[in-house]
UniProtKB/Swiss-Prot annotation:
GO biological process entries: actin filament organization; apical protein localization; brain development; camera-type eye development; camera-type eye morphogenesis; cell migration; cellular pigment accumulation; ear development
Domains (record comment): The ASD1 domain mediates F-actin binding.
Residue(s) carrying Phosphoserine: 231, 313, 325, 413, 851, 897, 921-922, 924, 974, 1036, 1039, 1171, 1173, 1297
Residues that bear Phosphothreonine: T925
Gene from which the chain derives: SHROOM2
Tissue: Abundant in retina and melanoma; also in brain, placenta, lung, kidney and pancreas.
Protein name (database record): Protein Shroom2
Gene3D superfamilies in UniProt: 2.30.42.10, 6.10.250.3120
Organism field: Homo sapiens
Length: 1616
């Protein structure tokens, strides 16, 4: 096919081919066998680059076809010409199932490095760097090559982005797959966000689902970061950057420092420009290597062309190294990515230009230092010392034609970790990792300067003056220099390049080279620089070098600690003799730096709080050796440091305050250089002293104190944004004594430290980064220290999480009051945060502080470390399992999610039982809530407004609170703040919230909170706001009341978990009316329903739910549920469904204890059941669908269908295979279920619940045929997604295995289910070989199980989306479902449309599992009754085989139907995209498109990781007691790594959810309700369909395995 012209293809394909023909020949490749195809795509029009196949997986289908080569540009897929967008290509590829036809354009030279190349190859392939962009991963020249390869070398913005993406992909896929497990915790943790994504991606590559595209999907779309640096990939990339700055200092990472990064880049690029293409990059890379070494290989991967030529395309954010850095990345990304991308890029280049002159001048001054130190550094870096040397030699980086690369290098140097830029980075990793050698070399040859130069050639410029000043001062460890440079760059980004340069010029040289990495936090460090406001980035870098002592402490807590140790020890001794380069190279280098820093400004260094050890930990992960050495050394001196820190922190606090004023002044007069330079030096000295002594590099995860300390600082900061800078300086330095460091922004122009929440939020809501930093930063950190402000704000939230007693409203209000910021405060915090960019890092720090505060609370609770770790998703899961105090769980989880990711390796059990705060505050949940609100708004303008108000309030609140807390607040806190629209309801809902917080939260933390996190705002709103606001409406609809009644307790749970229920506007009035009309009878049912739903799910689950409800807000819930339950019920139906889904999502079944899982599932089921209509709940209870209800339901359903017919929906066909009895039962049930002819709005609610009609019969089926019948409900469910709530858990369980039915059983554990399980057990008992597969009691974890807590249950998403899209028309009737039941092979287009593919998939899967169970049960029964057990067993097996075969057929049909749904959704997405593109600004459209692309990637990544993790966990569970410890340990390690990665992916999902909300908000301003509903549906269905597809595949696979096992088991018997 090669060389052959493609056959006639669509015009676009022809065009694509024509384009392809330009640079090479077209090759047609035919792949077959289905996904994964085994190749990774990069670039795309989104990235301004060709869509290139960057990697061909060995042994993959793509590899099987020799014609497909890495570097091929995809021109057409399946005869469809590509428009050039990667997402399009991915969709097409994913849409290809059996065969994939690719038309690729092959150039004589490939511009892409195969993904197979590993980071190690980056260094190995240094010579290759110039040859290919991927090669350039380790070498700057390669970037140029990549630039030309992918785009003009000048179009670095896209080129680096794409190339970076490519590199990232390459790095991710290859390095991730190779290194992810190899460097499970340290590297993953450090580069966790990106690295774990990489690893995840790579792992996922292994995973079939994620394999072909998981890498591409997981690959950070840095390239996308052009448009949206907050994209998952960008976040990843940025996280790397953040990580580097975090290592160097989070402040350098401050998103508020968009220019900081740019200026860093600009400062660095000045050096780089001259030789950036050739020398600077290598040299620069050498420098970045230092930072990169931790990521040694990652660095290069993240190395991105400078894009100096493309100011508009700022360098991609560094890959997230860790949750923290991920959060920081988001923040940084926001500033560096978006701002950097646009304004920052220009500024950066301007700054670069400015910096260059200064750099040139400085180079003259630092000329010698650079030359003297740089040569050695370059030599070390071996990163093309020649090139950078020259630049360094001048002290300025001659603008090279590869200025972009140089700039990139500059940014890399600033965030070496994120972009270890030189081929040397490969070497540097060792240098950095060794850090001792690095430092030794640096020290020996004044590597400080050399290192600094090498590490951040661009900074060298900005640091040139500093260099001049620093002279030998640059001798500081190169890593430190990097950190400082990074910090400087970040600061430069924050500060005008002039300022940065000026500050750098004024910066004391010694510090600059000394603690660059550590300087990232430097904001406090260089008060003068801050005052100067211009070179603070350089201050951060140069000053970081000069005042490096400060910076290093910030940049790398370990280094800072080391520096402090050195400062304390060495400074105290006046020598680093105690710290020997041989014994403690890192500490020695740090000490060297510290000495220099003290020279520069011990005070400042003290002022600069060292970044948390997490920073060090991250660098550590990048360079385990360095981290280990440093950590060991630091730990050795930790006690001393802590002592010093406590002492110095107090001192530094005061000093920091002084510095703060200066910083403020600096901020105000950011251009001051000379005086500020001196003052800055003084401050640096003071800050350095404080930082080194007061702040320790201790990792938060290692030492909870830092959190406490930081919270103190945060308190101060929170107290006074202006003082925040001091607080940042003093606070970090002063963390021990929060009093001294008044509220100092972590750094005014610098990177603020955000909590994981804040970081996540910053990622998802870059525009709120400042807000995140300030509002939440203040609150979170203050809470621990200044309980007044902190408690009021973040502390309150924490307390809320801990006590869950504070009403959510209080929290938002308190936060506002404490902050003294109105709800608008989020805006103000943003302003303040941006004004005090330091605050933003502080926000991170605050978040960290929050985490730490949470830890402190946890510590108080006796689980300080654990709460922090809850931050990780695994921890969240663990926390769900543990069900720790809601406060700690959620706050700590949210705050610590990023940090905890590092701690993922820690036993989740180690972590306190936390409510899945993330899930609770799941961005998607919030988003969905918001969307639901929007939907409701659309549906009912009146309710919609409150809903809108709530979401806005939520967003505002979120802006104030840390991202997760914000989410939690949105769910929990926003009820109060967002209850304002539904203030009327708010009283009751707040009561619910309060009750939930006070009572239910503790119990509901898992479920309720999880639900809250996952529940759509609609639910929350309906739960809380609906009661009062919708009180009339809600109350008027009897059915809604029922639904609420049914849902009320679930809603209560949901409300408990989702105090923000009010966020979701009450169901549209029309909905309540419909409910009134249709649910008049159900209105009475609410009470009964409440009673019934509880019994229905299961006594235990009901009890739990009721208890939670009663605890949380049973009175309110019941009272409001019954009187207000109608709308509430409607909303609650959604809420319940969402709650159940959310509960499932927040509390992955696998994560929760079986009982809890069952309860949750039951609750979900019950909620779902309740949602439909109380009547049905009783029916369920009775297990007999009321005929009258059936009639009503049919009418209602019909109405709903009719109403929904108006809904625009993508046809979703779900093939349900069920027995005729099931069909009949379900039909009859469906009739009762149908009665929920809710008001149109309510229909949507019901649709969301989808249980309204279907769940009813689903319930009925489930209850009537609980054992096997659940399948029928699922089948019925096609018409109603809500049954999926019930189904989904069963599906998941089924996915898990027929025991999946256990899941349903857990929900509805009926006698039949128990019988089925018993029979299955009997069969298993007879044939142990089938135990794993057939034993109902065997819980097989599936991808869906692990995905459960991540995504709001797809059913809910689909329901909401479908509701929005009004898919109910396809639900037209359970009859349709019944017909489908009758014709399982026929896609249940109508009902399935309602259910969406997800439901269809769920139904087939459920049917398959149910049938299997039925057969098993039958077989088991036969066995019981049969005298010949063996014969009976064989017969039963045969029956089971037949049933499974039928189910498999149904599942396959469902898969085909799902494909149709996917295609339909893709079409819808294309339509939506076209609309969005037409109405939205390009930047907004880019955000939309990147979000969509990231959504696909994140979902696939999560699926892949979930699948892999499920397999590992299953393997662990299946390990025999006699299994070798080595095997178990290996699996445990894999599990740990996968859990970390999974948690990282979850954070990505949270970020994605926040981005989704952002995009939704953007689109809401442009799109009509219908279009917006289509968008919501598309987005939700996109992920739901992907998940559903994966679930179907898993179920099919399970069924096939079951069949195989059964057949195999029968053969021996036959042989007998």
């Amino acid at each position: 096919m090669e060389g052959a012209e493609p056959r006639a293809r669509p015009e676009r394909l022809a065009e694509a081919e024509t384009r392809a023909a330009d640079g090479g020949r077209l090759v047609e490749v035919q792949l077959s066998g289905g996904a994964p195809w085994g190749f990774t795509l990069k670039g795309g029009r989104e990235h301004g680059e060709p869509l290139v196949i960057t990697k061909i997986e060995e042994g993959s289908k793509a590899a099987a076809v020799d014609k497909l080569l890495a570097g091929d540009e995809i021109v057409g897929i399946n005869d469809i010409g590509l428009s050039g967008f990667r997402q399009e290509a991915i969709c097409l590829v994913k849409g290809s199932h059996k065969t994939l036809k690719l038309v690729v354009k092959r150039r004589s030279e490939l511009g892409w490095r195969p993904h197979s190349w590993h980071a190690t190859k980056f260094s190995d392939s240094h010579p290759e760097l110039a040859a290919s962009p991927f090669t350039s991963t380790s070498g700057c020249p390669s970037w140029s090559g990549r630039h030309h390869a992918s785009s003009s070398s000048h179009d670095l913005s896209s080129s680096w982005e794409q190339t970076n993406l490519q590199r990232t992909l390459d790095h991710f896929s290859s390095l991730g797959s190779v290194d992810s497990l190899d460097h499970p915790s340290s590297r993953l943790s450090v580069a966790k966000s990106n690295s774990s994504i990489d690893h995840l991606g790579s792992h996922s590559k292994r995973d079939s689902a994620y394999g072909s595209f998981s890498t591409s999907s997981s690959t950070p779309d840095h390239t996308l970061s052009k448009a949206d640096t907050s994209s998952a990939e960008n976040i990843l990339y940025t996280v790397g950057l953040w990580e580097a700055p975090r290592q160097g200092g989070r402040q350098a990472q401050a998103a508020g420092d968009p220019q900081g990064s740019e200026e860093k880049l600009s400062c660095f690029p000045p050096r780089v420009p001259g030789d950036s293409g050739k020398g600077p990059r290598p040299e620069y890379n050498a420098e970045p290597k230092l930072a990169a070494p931790g990521r040694s290989n990652f660095g290069p991967v993240w190395y991105v062309p400078d894009k100096k030529k493309a100011p508009s395309s700022p360098p991609p954010p560094p890959p997230p190294l860790r949750s923290d850095s991920f959060a920081a990345t988001k923040s940084h990304e926001k500033a560096q990515g978006p701002v950097f991308s646009e304004a920052a890029a220009a500024q950066h280049f301007t700054a670069l230009a400015q910096a260059q002159p200064r750099g040139d001048r400085r180079p003259e001054l630092t000329d010698r230092p650079w030359r003297s130190a740089h040569p050695g550094s370059l030599g070390k870096g071996s990163g093309g010392p020649g090139c950078p040397q020259e630049a360094h030699a001048d002290g300025s980086w001659p603008p090279s034609k590869d200025g972009a690369s140089s700039r990139l290098q500059a940014s890399l140097s600033s965030s070496d970790v994120r972009f270890p830029q030189s081929p040397h980075s490969g070497r540097h990793p060792p240098l950095y990792s060794d850090h001792s050698p690095l430092c030794a070399d640096s020290l020996g040859q004044e590597p400080g300067a050399a290192s600094f130069q090498n590490d951040s050639p661009p900074q060298v410029r900005g640091l040139s003056s500093c260099d001049q000043k620093l002279g030998s001062g640059w001798q500081g460890p190169r890593p430190c220099v990097q950190g400082d440079l990074q910090a400087a760059q970040l600061w430069a980004g924050c500060w005008p390049s002039d300022t940065a340069l000026g500050a750098l010029e004024s910066l004391p040289p010694p510090t600059v080279g000394q603690s660059p990495r550590h300087h990232l936090p430097q904001p406090e460090g260089p008060p003068d620089a801050r005052e100067t406001g211009r070179c603070y980035p350089l201050d951060k870098g140069a000053e970081g070098c000069s005042a490096g002592a400060q910076e290093p402490p910030r940049a790398s807590r370990a280094e800072k600690a080391s520096q402090r140790l050195a400062a304390s020890i060495t400074w105290a001794d006046g020598e680093s003799s105690r710290i020997c380069p041989q014994e403690t190279p890192l500490l020695h280098s740090l000490t060297q730096e510290g000495k220099r820093r003290p020279e520069s400004s011990p005070e400042d260094s003290a002022t600069r709080p060292p970044p948390f050890d997490a920073h060090v930990g991250k660098p550590t992960r990048r360079s385990d050796r360095f981290a280990t050495t440093l950590r060991n050394e630091i730990q050795m001196h930790r006690a001393k440091l802590q002592k010093s820190r406590s002492t110095v922190a107090l001192t530094a606090a005061g000093e920091a305050e002084d510095g703060t004023g200066r910083w403020r002044a600096g901020l105000g007069g950011g251009t001051q250089e000379g005086p500020l330079a001196g003052t800055y030096k003084d401050h640096l000295k003071e800050a350095q002293a404080r930082v080194l002594r007061a702040t320790s590099f201790k990792r938060r995860d290692l030492d909870p104190n830092p959190g406490d300390l930081y919270p103190e600082s945060l308190e101060h900061r929170m107290g006074d944004p202006d003082t925040v800078p001091h607080f940042w300086e003093a606070g970090l330095a002063q963390p021990p004594s929060s009093t001294s460091g008044g509220p100092h922004p972590p750094r005014i122009g610098g990177r603020r430290r955000f909590t994981a929440e804040q970081k996540l939020k910053s990622y998802s809501e870059p525009e709120k980064m400042n807000e995140v930093g300030l509002t939440r930063g203040y609150s979170p950190h203050q809470h621990p220290r200044t309980s007044e402000d902190t408690v009021g704000t973040f502390a309150d939230r924490w307390k809320f999480f801990e006590e869950t007693s504070k009403p959510v409203p209080q929290r938002p209000a308190q936060k506002q009051a404490l902050h003294g910021i109105p709800r608008d405060k989020p805006e103000r915090p943003r302003t303040a945060g941006r004004t005090c960019e330091g605050t933003e890092p502080w926000s991170r720090t605050t978040s960290l502080g929050d985490s730490l505060n949470a830890h402190s609370a946890a510590e108080k609770a006796g689980t300080s470390d654990l709460p922090r770790r809850l931050g990780t998703f695994a921890e969240y899961q663990a926390s769900w399992k543990e069900q720790r105090k809601p406060l700690e769980a959620r706050s700590s989880g949210r705050c610590h999610s990023a940090d905890d990711i590092l701690d993922v390796s820690l036993d989740p059990q180690e972590r306190p039982q936390h409510v899945h705060g993330r899930s609770r505050s799941s961005p998607s949940t919030d988003h969905y809530k918001q969307e639901a609100s929007v939907e409701l708004r659309r549906q009912a303008g009146d309710p919609g407004e409150p809903r809108e108000e709530l979401p806005s309030a939520v967003r505002a609140e979120e802006g104030q609170s840390t991202p997760r807390q914000a989410d939690a607040q949105c769910r929990e806190g926003s009820p109060g703040s967002q209850q304002h629209p539904p203030s009327q309801k708010a009283p009751n809902p707040p009561t619910f919230s309060e009750l939930s917080h006070c009572r239910g939260a503790p119990e509901l933390p898992r479920e309720g909170r999880g639900r809250a996190g996952t529940l759509p705002r609609d639910y929350r709103y309906s739960e809380e706001s609906t009661p009062a606001d919708l009180g009339p409406r809600a109350q008027s609809p009897g059915s809604p009341l029922h639904a609420r009644g049914q849902d009320s307790w679930p809603v209560s749970s949901a409300l408990l978990s989702k105090r923000p229920a009010p966020q979701r506007p009450p169901p549209p009035k029309r909905e309540p009316r419909r409910y009134r009309a249709t649910d008049g009878a159900p209105a009475d049912a609410p009470v009964g329903v409440l009673g019934r739903p509880f019994p229905t799910p299961s006594p235990a689950s009901l009890d739990v739910y009721v208890a939670r409800l009663s605890l949380s807000h049973s009175p309110s819930v019941f009272s409001s549920a019954q009187p207000q339950d109608t709308p509430k019920a409607t909303v609650c139906e959604r809420g319940s469904q969402h709650v159940s889904g959310d509960a499932s999502r927040p509390l992955p079944e696998a994560l929760l204890p079986p009982k809890q899982q069952h309860l949750r599932l039951q609750t979900a089921t019950m909620e779902t059941s309740r949602s439909p209509s109380p009547q049905f709940a009783p029916q369920k209870l009775t297990d007999k669908p009321p005929l009258l209800i059936q009639d009503e339901d049919s009418t209602r359903i019909e109405r709903v269908m009719d109403n929904n017919t108006t809904v625009k929906m993508v046809p979703i066909k779900i093939v349900h295979s069920e027995s005729q009895p099931e069909k009949e039962s379900r039909q009859s049930l469906a009739c009762p279920a149908e009665p929920p002819a809710l008001p149109h709005g309510l229909e949507k609610d019901q649709i969301k619940t989808l249980s309204t009609s279907e769940q009813f019969y689903s319930r009925f089926c489930l209850y009537t045929r609980q054992g096997a019948e659940p399948e029928a409900p699922h089948r019925a469910q096609p018409a109603e997604p809500q049954p999926l709530g019930t189904q989904v858990p069963p599906e998941k369980d089924r996915c898990t295995s027929p025991p999946g039915l256990s899941y349903m059983k857990a929900k509805e554990k009926t006698v039949e289910d128990l019988k089925s399980e018993e029979l299955a057990r009997e069969i298993v008992g007879k044939d142990k070989s089938l135990a794993d597969i057939l034993d109902p009691s065997v819980k097989i974890k599936t991808t869906m199980d692990l995905m459960e807590g991540i995504f709001p249950k797809d059913e809910h998403l689909l329901e909401e989306a479908q509701q929005r899209r009004k898919l109910l028309p396809k639900i037209p009737s359970p009859r349709s479902t019944e017909e489908r039941k009758e014709e399982p092979s026929v896609p249940a287009a109508v009902s399935l449309a309602t259910n969406s593919t997800y439901y269809s998939t769920s139904a087939p899967k459920a049917e398959l599992l149910i049938k299997m169970k039925d057969l098993q049960e039958q077989q088991e029964h036969e066995e019981d009754s049969g005298s010949d057990l063996d014969h009976d067993l064989s017969v039963k097996k045969q029956e089971l085989i037949e049933s499974i075969s039928r189910k498999l057929q149904v599942l396959r049909e469902a898969r085909e139907s799902l494909l149709e749904d996917v295609q339909a959704n893709t079409v819808l997405g294309a339509e939506v995209e076209a609309i969005v593109k037409g109405v939205c600004k390009p930047s907004e459209f880019d955000k939309f498109r990147m979000f969509i692309g990231d959504l696909d990637k994140v979902v696939n990544l999560l699926l892949s990781l979930s699948g892999r993790l499920a397999r590992v966990e299953n393997a662990l569970n299946n390990l025999d007691d006699g299994a070798s410890p080595g095997d178990r340990q290996s699996l445990l390690e894999k599990q740990r790594v996968l859990i970390q990665q999974h948690e990282d992916a979850k954070e990505l999902k949270e970020n994605l959810d926040r981005r989704e909300r952002i995009v939704f908000d953007i689109l809401a301003n442009y799109l009509s309700e219908e279009s917006l509903a289509d968008y919501e549906h598309f987005v939700k269905m996109k992920s739901a369909l992907i998940i559903e597809q994966r679930e179907l595949e898993d179920k099919i696979h399970l069924g096939e395995e079951q069949l195989k096992c059964l057949l195999d088991s029968l053969q021996p018997e036959r042989g007998k």
